[in-house]
């Protein structure tokens, strides 16, 4: 009975301390993986340890080595409490080196072992905005997910470095603390988690990592009054469950709100412009433009020229069958508009 209670409440706590739930199922490929998810751990444990006091080490436990339940629990807490000690920048790295460096990257699907990425090479420096374009199924979203650490994909060859660190060996929670942010193409609903609690837990995780004092509820609420206005959402969205009952456009704007709160260094936007009406599109584009500066970088996945006209990316990359087959400036977008992708394909 105690074991069952532990499992049930652990699930509830995990919902709070895990950030950025990802729906692993592909909406276009069917529903067979619909319920599979994974999370970017952001360690919101401290906010809830008073509520869930059972997580603390009980005083009467003596033989911990013989108690798997308590060993698992203490292992979880140890990982959470050491987040401020995580190294998120490689020795000797500075702004003269690429923020993100990818060399000959190959990746497969865990299920079926189908190779999706077939030799990606890419360098992104601080202050740059890069755009990935290509036909459906070319591997654009897969590249975004692999960088973020999606468990549905396995890297079989190649290198990914972020701030000089070997990103391949970094767990997803460390990638988040490093400053990597992914705005999902299909944001997941969390019906049991209030939006304001989710956002504050995420923010405090990053503040703890920077050895900063956690933000109080009152301070957070004051900050959110201004931040939520930027994305065109009313304050009532903060008291609603994360993305639950939101329209497609509201979900996308809520993703951008998370970006504003966390202030990541490397932002991956996976078709953030899809599902937005005209007004939301302009508003979201302006928010992204204003957020962009010399101390952050963007990787933008999109099909639409209109977004790029507003964001003005430094580089355009065209993907086809898991490879980047063409890179250049904005003139590539005009060529795609006029003659499509076939002009870049080798016969």
From Swiss-Prot:
GO terms for molecular function: 4 iron, 4 sulfur cluster binding; ATP binding; ATP hydrolysis activity; metal ion binding. Its main location: plastid. This is Iron-sulfur cluster assembly protein SufC. The lineage of its organism: Eukaryota, Sar, Alveolata, Apicomplexa, Aconoidasida. Induction: Expression is not affected by oxidative stress. Proteolytically cleaved. Its EC number is 3.6.1.-. It catalyses: ATP + H2O = ADP + phosphate + H(+).
